[in-house]
């Protein structure tokens, strides 16, 4: 997406989350947050101020939106997942690079939901501690 479209989509998502109509539970590999803070891997060359501002924004959202927004950080050296989104009991989507695979069959959705639950159980940083962890990375 272009920047204006991405910003608009993010604003819409924040407004939806703030409305209290839905909860968001997100599992992210911890190395993504650490790489962003350190300016390595995908984030190499991105200005430190920009990276820190983004991480601070994420930490603020975690504080303000908890428990409607729960982010868990897992160790991708121990557990692996392609990006997956569960939209309730009837739809799950897996991102495979250039496209998404959508599943509507109940047993497949249950299987992907169980996989996501496993990521949450294996998290090395619980949702209650994510904002503190993020801030510790940008205060080094």
Model-derived features with residue positions:
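Hydrophobic protein-protein interaction segments
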Residues: 1-139
